[in-house]
Amino acid sequence: MNASLRYFSLAALAVAFSSTARAGDSYAVDPVHSSVSFMTSHAGISYIHGRFNDFSGKFVIDKADPAKSSFALAIKVESVDTNNQKRDEHLRAPDYFNAKQFPLMSFQSTKVKKVEGGYEVAGDLTLHGVKKEITLNLKGADKVVEFPKGTPRIGIVTTTVIKRSEFDMKTALEALGDEVHITIGAEAVKE
C-alpha cells in the first residue's frame, strides 16, 4: 500500500475510534495471518474465487461491557486478486469497483452484542461509495493466545453475503451473479 493511502486508512480508523471513548483491549489486525476472500457465481455454473491482499483493521474488546467493543476494517480495493491479471484489471475499472474513485471499502461497527461463541456486530459497510448497514456474526475474539510468547493475539472468523446491486455495482449481474460470498479470517495483535 502506498504511504498516503496507508496513512488515510489508519487515519480513518483513528477517527472512527476516537468518536467514542472505549475501554477494553485494543488489537491491530495482522495481515500476514489474516485474509479477506470472496466468491461469486460465474455464468450460473461455477464460482470465481478471489481475495484482497491489502487491508488493515482494529478491534477493541471490552469483556466487562461488550457493548463498548468495536470492530473496524479498511480494504484497499486495488488489491483485488482473482489469480487472473486481466480480470483483476477489469474489476478495478469503473465497470466494477472503480478503484480510482473509490479506493477503499470499509466496515465500522455501530452496535456490538456478545453472543455464545463470539459477537453479533451491526455496522456500516461502505463499498463503491454506498454505505449500507449489515450484521456480521463474528466467531472467536474471546480466546487470547500469546504467540510468540509475550505477544497477545485474538482471532475472528465471519462469513456474509452481500448483493452487488445494492452497492451500485450492476455490471454483468447475469454473468457474474449479484450475490458475493465474503469470508474474513483475522488474527489481531494487542497494541
Residue ranges and their predicted role:
Residues 7-8, 15-22:
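C-terminal segment of classical bacterial N-terminal signal peptides
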Residues 21-191:
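Low-complexity, acidic/polar, glycine-enriched regions of mature
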